[in-house]
Curated annotation (Swiss-Prot):
Record's subunit section: Heterodimer composed of CysD, the smaller subunit, and CysN.
Endpoints of the signal sequence: none
Lineage of the species this protein comes from: Bacteria, Pseudomonadati, Pseudomonadota, Alphaproteobacteria, Hyphomicrobiales
EC numbers: 2.7.7.4
Disulfide bonds: none
A matching Pfam family: PAPS_reduct
GO biological process: hydrogen sulfide biosynthetic process; sulfate assimilation
Pathway membership, UniProt: Sulfur metabolism; hydrogen sulfide biosynthesis; sulfite from sulfate: step 1/3
Taxonomy, superkingdom: Bacteria
Species annotation: Methylorubrum populi (strain ATCC BAA-705 / NCIMB 13946 / BJ001) (Methylobacterium populi)
Name the record gives this protein: Sulfate adenylyltransferase subunit 2
Length: 309
């Protein structure tokens, strides 16, 4: 009588492995349904993780979509250098789009304020690019834990022909089943990192040794204090107030955007373990340094309804 064959032991995935598997599944499902997909690449830590997951999802082949960066011309210089270096290292197709009409009018965060700048140089610019290249699926790195309006958005988010988001038209997503049916002119924003947290992102960056912009690590940087925010003076376009002089302070950034609209935090965290330790102890959102989130009640939801990332 033959001996009974023991059933194979069940492999228990770690928390990060489950998140990784979900994100890869989302990428593959969306690409299978898409006619012309693209990945929105904003150069920050979430975009770096998103790109890493996309490369894993379609390895050993090339990415089946290009990267699209909406360049407001006001990003930190280190961000642009990092973007160009990574695209070259990985052999990626990178499309950079700037709203030329807004550029010609001199629209900027200092001269016109955060709300006008964000609308013209980010939202309108993104809509222009999506229309020009006729993308029907755009991957983004937004996470639900970042902000209230993002918390209620679906992983597969339907946008109308004007790229607007209607929270009342969201679709159910039971058992990781996603509905990609759409009418002519409609499109989708797809968020593979929806269920990740800021801590998950940092733990995964450490685990996978993912390159990120050096601005996330503490260093001596020239900053001025404006409205309770430490703003880094990244170039000579930033106007100093009478008697104001940039001070060298040890700071880093929890989130990155246009430099006049992004506040730094004082911190000694110069390594990934130190950043993870700070994240564990944090009692405020990483987006506390984003000036655009303070453009009135419901600012982010209103921006998203207008077509923002």
């Amino acid at each position: 009588m033959s001996a009974a064959v023991a059933a194979p032991a069940r492999t228990r995935l770690t928390h990060l492995q489950r998140l990784e598997a979900e994100s890869i599944h989302i990428f593959r499902e969306a690409v299978a349904e898409a006619e012309n997909p693209v990945m929105l690449y904003s150069i920050g830590k979430d975009s770096s993780v998103l790109l890493h997951l996309a490369l894993k999802a379609f390895a050993p082949g090339r990415l089946p979509f290009p990267l699209l960066h909406i360049d407001t011309t006001w990003k930190f210089r280190e961000m642009i250098a990092f973007r160009d270096r990574r695209a070259k290292e990985l052999g990626l197709e990178l499309i950079v789009h700037t709203n030329q009409d807004g550029l010609a009018k001199g629209i900027g965060p200092v001269s016109h304020g955060s709300e006008v700048h964000t609308d013209v140089m980010k939202t309108q610019a993104l809509r222009q690019a999506l229309d020009t290249y006729k993308y029907d699926v755009a991957f983004g790195g937004a996470r639900r834990d970042e902000e209230a309006s993002r918390a209620k958005e679906r992983i597969v988010s339907l946008r109308n022909a004007q790229h607007r988001w209607d929270p009342k038209r969201q679709r159910a997503e039971p058992w990781h089943l996603y509905n990609f049916k759409k009418r002519r002119g409609e499109s989708f924003r797809v968020f593979p990192l929806s269920n990740w947290t800021e801590l998950d992102i940092w733990l995964y960056i450490e685990q996978e040794n993912i390159p990120i912009v050096p601005l996330y690590f503490a260093a001596e940087r020239p900053v001025v204090e404006r409205d309770g925010q430490l703003i880094m003076v990244d170039d000579d376009r930033f106007p100093l107030e009478p008697g104001e002089t940039p001070q060298q302070r040890q700071v880093r950034f929890r989130t990155l955007g246009c430099y006049p609209l992004t506040g730094a935090v004082e911190s000694p965290a110069a390594t990934l373990p130190e950043i993870i330790g700070e994240t564990l102890a944090a009692r405020t959102s990483e987006r506390q340094g984003r000036v655009i989130d303070k453009d009135g009640a419901g600012a982010m939801e209103r921006k998203k309804q207008e077509g923002y990332f």
